[in-house]
Each structure stands twice: as C-alpha cells, then as structure tokens.
A protein has these predicted regions:
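Active-site region of PLP-dependent enzymes
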Residues: 160-166, 173-296
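PLP-dependent aminotransferase-like
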Residues: 68-157, 164
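Phosphate-binding glycine-rich loop
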Residues: 26, 30-77, 91-94, 101-103, ...
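Hydrophobic/aromatic ligand-binding patch that stacks against planar heteroaromatic rings
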Residues: 90-92, 145, 169, 186, ...
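Conserved PLP-binding catalytic core of the aspartate aminotransferase-like
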Residues: 284-329
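Basic phosphate/pyrophosphate-binding loop/patch that engages nucleotide-derived ligands
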Residues: 120, 143-152, 195-215, 310, ...
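N-terminal "arm"/small-domain region of PLP-dependent enzymes with the aminotransferase-like
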Residues: 1-29, 232-234
Length: 329
C-alpha cells in the first residue's frame, strides 16, 4: 500500500476484530468444530447466484481444486488468457497439463471466443476465463464454443466480485468458478482465502472431498454412524480448508459488498470521465448489459498523442509523486 491520503486497503473495523476474538475464545476454530465456514459457504453461494460453494485457504488452490475436479492432467491442454496473474497459468502446469495462451481483445483485455478458437487442438480440455480487473468476459459465445467442442469452463473471478454479465453474476455461468480473498482483493478473509462455486452437485462433492483429505460429505453427514465414529476417507485429497477466523471476516465483508461495489463504481466512473477529456488517454466502454467490478480502473495511453518528453511511465511517476496510487500492467 502506498503512503497516500487515500483510505487504506484492506479495510477492517472493530466488527471484524470482535468477531475474530469471539471465534478464538470459543475454541471452535476449524471447519470440524465451528459453523462460520459452513455459513460463509452458503451465503457466498447465494450471493454469487450458484447452488454450491467450497471455502478454501486461498485463491490459488481454488484454481487447483477446480482443475482436479475436472480431471485435468498430463496430456491435456487448457486455454488461458495471455493477460492474467501467474496463478491462472501455474495451476495448469501444476496439474501436469499444458497452458495454451489465447490473445486478448483491445478493450476488455480478456480473451474471446474468436481468440480461443484460434488455438484449440484435439488435446484441449478446458478454458480458464479471467474476468480481468472486473470486466466480464463475453461468456455466451465462449460457452457456445465450449459446448461445441465438449470443453469445461472455469471462471477465474479473483478480480471480479460483484461483476455481472448480461444480468448474471460472474461465476454462475461456467462449470466452476474460482474466487480469491487475498488482502488486495475486493473483499478479503483476513489476508488470504478462496472459494469455488458451482451449480453441479457432483463437482461440488468432488471439490469438497479433495480439500479435506478425501472425506466425503455424504459419508460424514448423510449416513448413520455408530458411537465413536470419526472419519471415513473414500478417496485421497489434501488439506485446503479455510479457517473459522477467515470465514467470520468473510461473512462480515460479504454483507458490505453492495455498498463497496457502488463506491468502487462511483470512484472509477469519476476517473474514467476525467480521462476521457484528455486526448492522450483512451477509456474503453463496457457493454451496456454488463456491470464492472472495478477492481482495477484501466486507462490506456495513446503514445502518439503525448507531448514531447512524456511517456506512460512519466505519467505514472507524476501521479505517484502526488500521492495517487497508480501502476502499469
């Protein structure tokens, strides 16, 4: 975080601090003893317009477990945007598959059905759609293309909490969505955290089990057990569970999302309106049916319109020198 007069981010209040203290003093601090994470999963699924959610330790493992549930592995190719954070790509490599980069559109900076189609091969098994900076991918043509080629679609919503595509929340359109609650994201669960959402019960069950050493929800919660029953592992997995202290923060921040989203859009709109008045800057226009999450506020420089001695980097440096957070990339 730059040393600026602007409000700090992440932003916590006494409400989060008191809630975390209550969880710790309850001694019910993980998924198996507390109820905060289970409640957070239900509330986040409802908020994102999906049937199911699995809370996780961070957003990177959300991508990992999504690929695992879709049985992505050696010999498979996954098409991913050429403009994204490393985790969208490294998760594919860590699954043993091959990332294939598709070009992005000039305005949205997202890949499109056309750029995806150009790199498909018989080995392509899935797509990772990154809603970069909060601008939704054009999902209808992408889903049509996926259906035509029998491909699975993961929505990477790490930067898009609150964005909508043609009236639908992002994350509710593909087969699985992966979310991040890292400290710099639109909402955070105390520094790290993640979630996967889906409308497919089998995918949910597979992800829920894998993140908890292969325990089955059905085996643990829906069967009768003799006294003294502990755990039944019906498959192998790992431990990517979210902590109760993370979940209680997430529940509080989720309740603030409507207010925060409105504030983000208001601030972004003011920046974009001013930038449009400057001939050396270009501001893309979002499709009217979509809603931006305003995680980032992109403005593009027209180098040919700059005065002598000016460049993108000088513009950034001048803004930072005046205490305005500004970055490239």
């Amino acid at each position: 975080m730059l040393n600026t007069p602007f409000s700090p981010w992440p932003s916590f209040t006494e409400e989060e601090a008191d809630a975390v203290r209550a969880v710790i003093l309850s001694n019910k601090v993980n998924y198996w003893t507390g109820q905060e994470t289970r409640s957070f999963e239900k509330e986040f699924a409802a908020w994102s317009g999906t049937e199911y959610a699995v809370a996780l330790a961070n957003g990177t493992v959300a991508l990992d477990v999504a690929l695992k549930a879709l049985d992505i592995g050696p010999g498979d190719e996954v098409v991913v945007t050429s403009r994204t954070f490393l985790a969208s790509v490294s998760s594919i490599v860590n699954a043993g598959a091959v990332p294939v980069f598709a070009d992005v559109a000039l305005d949205s900076q997202n890949f499109t059905a056309e750029t995806i189609s150009a790199v498909l091969t018989p080995r392509t098994k899935a797509l990772i759609c990154v809603h970069l900076a909060g601008w939704p991918c054009d999902m209808d043509p992408i889903m049509d293309l996926a259906a035509e080629h029998d491909l699975k679609v993961i929505e990477d919503c790490a930067q898009a909490h609150g964005a909508h595509y043609k009236g639908r929340p992002v994350g509710s359109i593909g087969h699985i969505a992966a979310w991040s609650f890292c400290q710099d994201k639109i909402m955070t669960t105390g520094g790290e955290g993640g979630m996967v959402t889906t409308n497919d019960r089998q995918l949910w069950a597979d992800m829920w089990a894998y993140k908890d050493h292969g325990k089955s929800w059905e085996a643990v919660y829906e069967r009768e057990h003799a006294p003294g029953f502990r755990w039944l592992h019906e498959s192998f997995g790992t431990n990517w569970r979210m902590l109760e202290v993370q979940a209680v923060i997430g529940r509080i921040q989720l309740r603030r999302m409507q207010e925060w989203h409105a504030a983000r859009l208001k601030n972004a709109s003011r920046i974009w309106a001013q930038a449009r008045q400057l001939p050396a800057l270009r501001v893309p226009v979002l499709p009217v049916a979509d809603v931006h999450a305003a995680y980032k506020c992109y403005v593009f420089v027209r180098p040919q319109a700059l005065k002598a001695s000016w460049s993108r980097d000088r513009i950034l440096n001048e803004m930072v020198a005046r205490g305005v957070p500004a970055f490239s990339g």
